[in-house]
Amino acid sequence: MTVVPGETQCEEAQPAANGSSSPVLLQPFRRPRTDSRSRLDSGSNNTTLSEDCARKSILRTLKSLGVEIDESASFEAIIDSGGIEKLADFWRKRDSSSEIAFQGLLSVLEYCLQHSFDTNEFFEKFVNALGYHTVQFWRAGVPYVFDSDMSHGTKYRDALLFSLTLYDVNTGKSRLKELYAAVPGIRKSLLGVHAKRFGEQYHHLQRRRSVSSRGGSLRGSMDSLNDSGQNGAEDVIGVEDEEEAQKFRGKRTSISLDPAAAGEVMFTIEDGACFPSGGLANTHFQQRVINVSNAPPVSLKREKSGEWEIKQGSGGLVSCVDPIMSVNQENMWLANLGMNIDKKKMLRYDDCLRSQEHTLENMRSTELLNVTDDSAPLAPATNTLGLPLMRQALADVLFHVIADDDIKEQNEDEQSRNVREEMSLLGVLNQYNRSNYKLNPVVVQEQDYNVYYGGISNGLLWPALHNLPEYIVADYDDPKVLYEHWCAYVRVNYQFAIDAVRNSRPQDFIWIHDYHLMLTGMIMQSLDSSLEIGFFLHIPFLPPDNFFTKYRLCAFPIMRGLLRFTKVGFQTHRDRAKFVELVGIHLPTARVTYDEKMDIHTVTYQGWSCSLGVFPVSIKNEDFLKVAQSAETIKKADDIRKEILGETPVDSARLLFSVERFDYTKGIKEKLLAYRRYFERHPDRIGKDVLYQVAVTNRRSVDTYRMYQDECIQMAEDINKEFATDEYPNWKPLIFRTDGLQRADLVAHYLAMDVGVVTPKKDGMNLVAKEMLVCNPSAGLVLSTGAGSEIQFTMAGLHPDDGDKCYHRVVDVYDADHYADAFYEAAVEPEAERAAHGQRLNEFIMNNDIERWSTAFLDPGWSHLVIRQSEIKDLDDFYSLMMRTRDVRRQIVERVLKGIPIRSHFSISLSNAKESLLLACQPGTRTLHLKPSLEEDEQTEPAHFDIANELDEFEKDLNFMKFIQSDDVYNVEQFINSLQEYHPVSADKFRDEVIELGDMLTEADHFNFFFTDRDGTLKSYSCSYPASIQPAYSGVIQAQFARRCAQTCAIVTTAPLMRIGVLDVSTIPEGYYYFGASAGREWFIDPANKFKDQSIPEEDLELLERVFAAISDLLEEPKFKHFTWVGSGLQKHYGHITIAHQDAFNSVPRHQVRAIDQKIKDIIHRIDPDQHTLKVKETETDIKIFLKSESGEIFDKGQGIRLLVEHMKCDISNGTILVCGDSSTDLPMLQACLEANPSGVYTVWVTRSDELKTTVRELCERFGNKNFVFVSCPEVLLGGMAQATIREISIGRPGPRASHDSE
C-alpha cells in the first residue's frame, strides 16, 4: 500500500492470518495510510473521510469508557457536547481506563494535526480540555507524533508546533513552552541548535589556527588588541607588554618561531606540561543585522534566453535600510521573492512520484511554484527544509529548479557549463551574496501568501491602521472569512519567524519591518527568549474605535505581539501616543513608564518588557543631491517649466507638483476637490497655476483601489474641461499622470516646481516632502497633518502656533475651502519669503538623514535593557543602581560561559552606571554623600561612602569585555596582564605572584575540593555589603575554574545567605558553587537542596532575635543611625549577628566606634547577663554576636566544612583540596582540611600581614604541609585561577620532531 503523509485508513480492524484482529489498525498515529491517487480518482472527500474516521474512533473510545452518547452524532457535535473533556477527565484519573482515554485523545489530536489548516477551533478545545496537564500529555503523546513522522513521512511535528503557536497568538498564553518543557529536544531540533554550535566551534577552531600562523611576528598570541600607533588612549594592552604577558605561561609553555615554517608559531612544550585550550569564550562571530521584510531589496527577472537578472531595488525600505546593511557583508536580508509553493500542484507532484506511469520529468518542477517561465524568481531549498507547511520531498525539486539542471546541454564544454551555472538563479543569487549582504528568500504556500498579502494585510490592516475604516474590505464582516484569513496571516508570520531564528546567532540583532509581520516577535521569542528583536512600523498606528470589538480576533494578538519585540519604533509621536493609549485601555495589567530625558516609553506586560521610541524616517540626501546638481537635470527642469508654463509665463504663474502612489490614503480625491474649489474661490489664478499630479497606479486587482482610481481620473478630466478658457488656449489647469518617473526625471520635476503638495489623509512619514526640499530648497510646501513628516516638522518648531511658519498646513483634507486657501497662500507667497522658509526646512532635513535614522534605531542605548545615566541622591538610588548592575553582570557571565558573544548594551550599561556614580561623587574625590532617604530633612547626617573599589571593578569589567570579544585566543593572558595596575605594590610583584601561584595550581593539576572565603579573598572589600556586587570578570573566572580545575567547589562566608546576603551579590550561575553562609551554618546547594545546622535550640534563636530587635531600635537613634550603612551594616545570620562599627577605609571616628560598642555590650548584658548563650567577638571592622555551640565554642568555618561534608557525604580525606582565605576567621577552614588530609591540601592566602602569614605557615608545617602561597590582593588570586583555566587539555607531549632542524 502506498504511504501518503497525513491520511489515515479508518476501516475496522480485519482478522489477521491467525484469526486474531490486529490492534495496530485502531491505534492513532500508527494506522496504515491509503493511496492518494485512488482517492482522487474516486472523487472521495478526504476531509469527510478523515472526520468520519476520527468520529468512529472517539465513539468507540467513549463507549469503552461507559459514556452514553448518540452514535449518529457528527464529529463536531461530539466535540461540542464535551467529548474531549470527558476523555481528558478519564485520562487524568490514572486508573485502568486512563490508557483507553489516552488513545481517544490521541485520535482527536491526530485529526487536528491532519487538518491543521481548517480545524483550529477543535485544537483550541483540545488544549483547553487538557488544562494544567498538558506537559504530562505531551510527554506521553509526542513520541507517537515523532514515530509517525519517522515511519510514515507525515509532518505532524510541524503541524503541532504551528497549532500551538496559533493557540498562543490568539489566546495570549504560552502553551508552546509547555511542549518544550515536556520534550526539550524538539526546540533545539527545530532551530538547528546543534548545527549552529558546530559552526561556532568550527569557526573558533579556524580562528585559533589563523592566530597560530599569523604573519611571522614574534608577538604571536600576545599581540595587543589595538595598534598603539593608531588608537592612542584607546589601547588596552601595548606591544611592550608582550614579554610580560608571556611570563604568565611560566615555565610550562614557551613559544618559538620556526624560520622554515613560513611564519607559523610553533609551541615547544616541556615534559608533562600543558598547552592552552583557548580563552574564556569559544566563539568569535560578530554581531550582524538580520533584516526581515515582506518585500525583498531586489527584483528578479528571467529573460527569454533562460538567464536570470537581479537588480537592486529602489523602494523606500531599501533606501532606509541599505546604509546600515551595506556596512557588513555578513548582514542578512530575509524576504519573500514572490514565488511560493502551490499546494494544489504539490499534490499533483506527489501523485507523480507515486504513479508508475509518471516520472519527475512529466511535470516541470517550476509548476510547483507560483512563477512563469519568463519571470520565475525561485527560492533556495536551504531555507525551507524542515519548515512546517512544506513537504520535505519538495526540497529536492526546489534545488533542482534553482540549479536549472533541466536546461543543461548535452556535451557542453567546461566553459559553457560555467557560464550557464553563473547565469542560473542559484548562480545569480550566490553572486549577489558574494558582493552584497546575504539575501535569503522565505518560501511559503502560495494560497496563504495571497490571503496574507492581498487579503488581510491590504484589505484590513492597511486601512485600519490608517484610520480609514471605510476602505476595509466588506468580506471581513464575515467572522469565518476573518478567521480563515487571520490564520493565513499567522502561518506566514510563523514561516518568517522560523526562518529568522534559524538563520540568527545569539549576538545578532533582528530587525522586522512593517505591518505584514507584526506577530514575528512573539513567535520568535517563544522559540528563543534570548533574541534581541526590533520592529519598525512604517505606516501610522491609528486604528478606528471599533477595531478592538469588530476585529477583536486580530486586534488583541497584534497588541500583544508588538509588545513582545525588544523595541518598537514608530514614525511619529502621534502614533506612539495612540499605541500607549490603547495599551492602557485594552491591556490594563500592563505597566507603562516614561523616561522624559530619553523620550522612551517602556511597557511591561506578562513578564516581557518593550521599549517604544519615535524615529521619523528620512532619505539618503546625497543620492538626490547628486542628481539635482547635475547640469543635465537642471536643463531638464528648465525644459519642464517651459513645456508646462510656456516660454514666457506670467510672473505670478506657479507650478504645483505632487507625486505619490495611487492609493486612497494619499488623499488624491480630496486634493482634486480642493483644487477645483481653489479656482472657484480665486478665479484670478485661472490661466496662471498648474497642478502636475503623478499618481502611480497600483493594486488595480483590488476592487476598492480600481474604483477609487477610476473616479479620480474622471475628476481630473472634469476639472480640465470645467476651467478651460479661450483667454489661455494653451493653458491646462491639471496634468494627471498615472505612470511613474525615473529618479532623474523625478528630481527634474522637483527642481521645476514652485510649490510641492504633499497632503495624504494618513501616512507613516511620506518622504516625498523631504525629497522635494532637499532638491529644491527655494520651493514652497503645502503639507497636511496626515503626513508623519508634518508632525516631525511641527515638533522641530518649523510651524509654531505663534511665529514664522515654514510651510502651509492643511489640517483637514476634507475641508475643501481651507484646503483651497492653503493652495492660494502658497501660490501668492513672495519668492524671497518662500525661499527662506524652504531653506530652514532643507537644513533640518539635511541634519536628519537616513543614516542618522537607522543608526538611532539600532543604537542599543535607548532600549530598556540598558542602564541609563541617572542622578544618585539617596541610599535607595545607590543600592538600586548596584542591584541593576548585578543583573547585567549576571547576564554577561552567563553569556560568556555559554560561548555567546556579549551584546554592546552590556558595556553601555556598566559605563553609564560608572558615570552616574562619578557624577554623584564629591568634587575631586571618589566619595559619595547620600541622604538616607529622600524624606530625610537637610539636618540629617548624610551617608559617606568611599566607592573607589566599586569604580575600579566597573573599569575592570569594561576592560574584560574588550578582551573577551577579541579575536585573540590568548585573551586570558591579556586580561590578566591588565590587572597588574591594581596591585598594591607593583606590576613586577603582581607578575611574580601570579607565576608562583600558577605553578602551585599547575602542580596540583586538579582539585577534588575547593573551599574559599569571598570578601577580601576573591573580592576586595566594598564600602558596604549591598554594594559588593561580584564583578562579571570574577564570576567568569571563578565559574571556569570550577568547571575545569575543581570538582566540588564551595564559597564559605560569614555573610547571611539571603536578604542582602551572598546569593544577592553573586553573579555566578547556579551549579558551579555551593554557598555556605553564616560561617557555613546554613548551606545552599541548589534551589531544591538547602540545609542548616540543626543543633541550635529554638529558645536560643529567639534570644538572638531579641538582640537583633534591640540593636535595630538602637540604630534608629539619630546618634547611631549612620551605622546602618557603615560597611556591611546590621546583618542577621543563622546563629549570629554582625554590626559594622568601622569601614575598610577607617572613616568612622574612634569615639563613635567606642560609643556603639558600649551600647551593644549593654544590650547583650541585659538580655544574657551571664553570657551563657551569647558570645561577643570584636574585629577591626565589626562586632559579631554568636550563639555558642553545644561545646560552648563559637561556630566557625571549620565546623561549617564538617557540616557540608557530613550532609553531602563528601570524602575529603582523599584527593587534593584548595583552600583560600584572607583573615583569621578562615583559619578553622584550613585546619579542618589539614586534619582530614594533611598532604593533599593546597592553600592560598590573600594577605600582607606578616602575623597572619606566620600563623598560616606554622599551621601547615604542623601537619607537614608546604603547599602554601601568599598573594597581596584578590586580583592576583583571580589572575592565577584564570591562568589555570587554560590547562583544560593536559597532555604530556614530546618536544619538537627530531627531523625538525634538518627540515
Curated annotation (Swiss-Prot):
GO terms for molecular function: alpha,alpha-trehalose-phosphate synthase (UDP-forming) activity; trehalose-phosphatase activity. Residues 1-48, 205-251 are annotated as: Disordered. This is Alpha,alpha-trehalose-phosphate synthase [UDP-forming] 2. GO terms for biological process: trehalose biosynthetic process. Residues 212-221 have a biased composition (Low complexity). CDD domains: GT20_TPS. Disulfide bonds: none annotated. In the N-terminal section; belongs to the glycosyltransferase 20 family. InterPro entries: Glyco_trans_20, HAD-like_sf, HAD_sf, T6PP_C, T6PP_helical. GO terms for cellular component: cytosol. Its EC number is 2.4.1.15. Catalyzes the production of trehalose from glucose-6-phosphate and UDP-alpha-D-glucose in a 2 step process. It catalyses: D-glucose 6-phosphate + UDP-alpha-D-glucose = alpha,alpha-trehalose 6-phosphate + UDP + H(+). Keywords: Glycosyltransferase, Transferase.
